[in-house]
Amino acid sequence: MDQQKVNLLNYNYSQLRELLIAWDEKPFRAQQLFQWIHQVGICDFAQMTNLGKVLRNKLSQLACIDLPEIVACQKSADGTHKWLLKLECGNCIETVFIPEANRGTLCVSSQVGCALNCSFCSTAKQGFNRNLSTAEIIGQVWLAARELSDNNGTHDKKITNVVMMGMGEPLLNFDNVVSAMNIMMDDLAYGLSKRRVTLSTSGVLPEMERLREVSPVALAVSLHAPTDELRNELVPINKKYPLSQLISLCKRYFKDEPRRKVTFEYVMLKGVNDQPEHASQLIKLLHNVPAKVNLIPFNPFPLTQYQRSSRETIDAFRDKLMKHGINTITRKTRGDDIDAACGQLAGEVKDKTSRSQRWQKLHFMSKTEKSTELTISSEEIA
């Protein structure tokens, strides 16, 4: 990207309006420009025909619409898409689209790598490099909409839901994530409702409080254990923000909207957190919490110490929670044949925490040996 130009993907509608006013342009031009970028999916100013030639020339001189580069695309047997996206810094992130009968969910990354080191997650094993910009977050949505479109013009409505559940802890990149989610929910952009944008967090409590105040999106909490002792092992941030504090916040998170519930994600690990006593502890923990539970069959990755719970064990765990009035579903594993399932996203990270370089080499060697065909995109998006 030209360092002298501003990337318009970093701007929400109000910011774009202020920018154009500062450039001595009419404020209404912001709506036209914003719609061209996000609704129509155009990044060539010359094609924005209702802006006027003078403004188009000015935009070409002062601004750009700079997107991540699609390095590779994989499509699962179940229809799941995974894109490997290269950033300007040279690192890569992954974005996943999961199609279903009545909706299409895009799983978006918020960081290059992750610093939280959850023991069952592939991303965590690579360490952390940096936060993504607003442009790099919303750029994932832009590119997915373009790639899923049946034509090369208007962005279709195949993406009905966005989940901030890709690489990284979204709340540790608070400002950029909230800015990107606001663009997703803007009727002049992607027009997603607040219930169709979900942020998943491991429980960064101060930022959860901030999110509650400034953004109406759905909340998912990566719980994975019913006791502090076990959660300290699986989700180390629990040592800083223990369950008592986390659950207290979740109880009042949607106090002004009593019909909304917090989703608790619970990965099922064989012999670790899947026993009847764990279900009993979870029932006690979630008492009087407006909750629904999403049981996630563990998706293995190279060098992991964990195994997936059996179907019978998962079903028994679910049934026990349901018997005690907790709305519980088991997530259907999607895209695991292309390492696109929950906990498997890896990308390519230049780790600034120096964590497990050997793990990275073995991981990517293993991915190559799977011989899953990569379709290299030759289309230039910028």
UniProtKB/Swiss-Prot annotation:
Note: Reaction proceeds by a ping-pong mechanism involving intermediate methylation of a conserved cysteine residue.
Reaction catalysis annotation: adenosine(2503) in 23S rRNA + 2 reduced [2Fe-2S]-[ferredoxin] + 2 S-adenosyl-L-methionine = 2-methyladenosine(2503) in 23S rRNA + 5'-deoxyadenosine + L-methionine + 2 oxidized [2Fe-2S]-[ferredoxin] + S-adenosyl-L-homocysteine; adenosine(37) in tRNA + 2 reduced [2Fe-2S]-[ferredoxin] + 2 S-adenosyl-L-methionine = 2-methyladenosine(37) in tRNA + 5'-deoxyadenosine + L-methionine + 2 oxidized [2Fe-2S]-[ferredoxin] + S-adenosyl-L-homocysteine
Keyword line: 4Fe-4S, Cytoplasm, Disulfide bond, Iron, Iron-sulfur, Metal-binding, Methyltransferase, rRNA processing, S-adenosyl-L-methionine, Transferase, tRNA processing
List of residues binding S-adenosyl-L-methionine: G168, E169, S200, S222, L223, H224, N299
Annotated residues for binding of [4Fe-4S] cluster: C114, C118, C121
GO cellular component assignments: cytoplasm
Root EC class: transferase
Cofactor, how bound (note): Binds 1 [4Fe-4S] cluster. The cluster is coordinated with 3 cysteines and an exchangeable S-adenosyl-L-methionine.
EC number, UniProt record: 2.1.1.192
Subcellular localization(s) per the UniProt record: Cytoplasm
Predominant localisation class: cytoplasm
Gene3D superfamilies: 1.10.150.530, Aldolase class I
Role of this protein: Specifically methylates position 2 of adenine 2503 in 23S rRNA and position 2 of adenine 37 in tRNAs. m2A2503 modification seems to play a crucial role in the proofreading step occurring at the peptidyl transferase center and thus would serve to optimize ribosomal fidelity.
Organism: Legionella pneumophila (strain Paris)
Family annotation (PANTHER family): 23S RRNA METHYLTRANSFERASE, RADICAL SAM CORE DOMAIN-CONTAINING PROTEIN
Pfam families: Radical_SAM, RlmN_N
Radical SAM core domain ranges (all copies): 100-336
Cofactor: [4Fe-4S] cluster
Protein's name according to its UniProt entry: Dual-specificity RNA methyltransferase RlmN
PROSITE patterns xrefs: RADICAL_SAM (PS51918)
Active site residues according to the UniProt entry: E94 (proton acceptor), C342 (s-methylcysteine intermediate)
Disulfide bridge positions per record: C107-C342
UniProt record, GO biological process: rRNA base methylation; tRNA methylation
